[in-house]
């Protein structure tokens, strides 16, 4: 067999909500101690420990795109240690793959949108319009040039680079 495999990691930029959670937790610890005393500090430390275990690892996310022939699999890697499968689909069943700001996408109105990009406004983001679970879906990805070439091999006239 002559399978084509390519993997790409895209680190997601930290969102404002993640920074707000960290700032809020520190503010509660600092300003709560004089008001209620040492008990407030212990409660804040306990909340920070719970947040450190459950919330903070979810703030550091990388998306891994793996394309094997025409099957695209997207995984999220949290804190560089935990992997979670997000989505997989056959790109040949996509209606169109085009840059996010392409006018070719104006006629498509997805029911559900998945965003697996870095969050950088200057990045080259592509939209994959595909039917998933009987719903029209839009999957935003951020492929590099090599992944685009792999996808073009299988997509033909349904892939646009404009």
Each language-model region and where it sits:
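N-terminal membrane-targeting/pre-transmembrane regions
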Residues: 1-26
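Transmembrane helix interruption/hinge and helix-loop junction motifs
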Residues: 31-43
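Transmembrane alpha-helices and immediately adjacent membrane-cytoplasm interface residues
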Residues: 43-61
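A cytosolic-side transmembrane-helix exit/cap motif
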Residues: 59-71
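Membrane-cytosol interface motif
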Residues: 68-86
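Structured surface patches comprising rigid loops and adjacent beta-strands/short helices at the edges
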Residues: 86-106
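Cytosolic, membrane-proximal regulatory domains of ion/volume homeostasis and mechanosensation machinery
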Residues: 100-120, 124
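A membrane-cytosol interface segment of integral membrane proteins
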Residues: 115-162
């Amino acid at each position: 067999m002559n399978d084509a495999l390519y993997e790409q990691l895209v680190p997601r930029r930290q969102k404002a909500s993640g920074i707000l959670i960290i700032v809020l937790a520190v503010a509660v610890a600092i300003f709560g101690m004089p008001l209620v005393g040492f008990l407030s500090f212990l409660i804040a430390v306990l909340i920070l420990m719970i947040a450190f275990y459950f919330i903070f690892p979810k703030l550091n996310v990388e998306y891994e795109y793996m394309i094997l022939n025409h099957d695209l699999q997207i995984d999220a890697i949290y804190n560089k240690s935990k992997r979670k499968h997000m989505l997989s689909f056959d790109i040949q069943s996509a209606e169109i793959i085009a840059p996010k700001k392409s006018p070719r996408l104006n006629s498509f109105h997805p029911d559900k949108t998945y965003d697996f990009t870095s969050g950088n406004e200057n990045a080259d983001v592509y939209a994959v319009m595909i039917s998933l679970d009987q719903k029209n879906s839009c999957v935003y990805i951020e492929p590099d040039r090599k992944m685009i070439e792999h996808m073009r091999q299988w997509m033909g006239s349904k892939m646009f680079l404009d």
